[in-house]
């Protein structure tokens, strides 16, 4: 089973960590095994934190809508998978949380389900499965945070902030292109005006 604590793995993770190190003028590392290099270990930790932080907002590439989760036949428990960042009811309310590795319904105050539940899932994706603009955003944001915490060069901060802003803008464009958003549909006020 994969570890979702370290969801950024292999050559892609090494490349991302080296990009973070390069942002402050540090030489690249050839491996992340053992975390012998303190800077590489810190960069890796920040990279994984930022990866989870950005993905937890929910984007077109990691939201799965209308998924039915079925309880175990004997225990009536639904396992809360390690790659779930958030479960929401299909009405958009976040009534389901992780309690002891199982789905817990805060409304009924129970982790036992007689039947399946239909939810929208924000799922933690592997780094390689994400669109390029999101990988770029994660690395630039992690680089800026790494600089702030361990290096603190204001001239580097300015450059990294510009790169992060550009990366975020590219992600917003991606969402607009692939999100299927429509200003005439999904807004109660606009729908009311159109049906007059």
Swiss-Prot record:
InterPro entries to which the protein is assigned, alphabetical: Tail_Gp11
Compartment(s): Virion
An individual GO BP term: symbiont genome ejection through host cell envelope, short tail mechanism
Gene Ontology CC terms: virus tail, tube
Purpose: Structural component of the short non-contractile tail. The tail complex is involved in viral genome delivery. Forms the 12-fold symmetric toroidal domain immediately below the connector protein gp8. Once the tail tubular structure is formed, the interface between gp11 and gp12 generates the proper environment to interact with the six fibers, each made of gp17 trimers.
The family this protein is said to belong to: Belongs to the tail tubular protein gp11 family.
Name the UniProt record assigns to this protein: Tail tubular protein gp11
């Amino acid at each position: 089973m994969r570890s979702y604590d370290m969801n950024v793995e292999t050559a892609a993770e090494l490349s991302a960590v080296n990009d973070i190190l390069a942002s402050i003028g540090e030489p690249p590392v050839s491996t992340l095994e053992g975390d012998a290099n303190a800077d590489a270990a810190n960069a890796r930790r920040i990279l994984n934190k930022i990866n989870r932080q950005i993905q937890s907002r929910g984007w077109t590439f990691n939201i799965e809508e209308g998924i039915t989760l079925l309880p175990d036949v004997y225990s009536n428990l639904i396992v809360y998978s390690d790659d779930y960042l958030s479960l929401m009811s299909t009405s958009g309310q976040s009534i389901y949380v992780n309690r002891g590795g199982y789905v817990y319904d805060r409304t009924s105050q129970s982790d036992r389900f007689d039947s399946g539940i239909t939810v929208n899932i924000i799922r933690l994706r592997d780094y390689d499965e994400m669109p390029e603009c999101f990988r770029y955003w994660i690395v630039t944001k992690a680089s800026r945070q790494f600089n702030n915490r361990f290096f603190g060069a204001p001239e580097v901060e300015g450059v990294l902030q510009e790169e992060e802003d550009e990366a975020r803008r590219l992600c917003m464009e991606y969402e607009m292109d692939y999100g299927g958003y429509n200003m005439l549909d999904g807004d109660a006020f606009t729908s009311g005006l159109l049906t007059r």
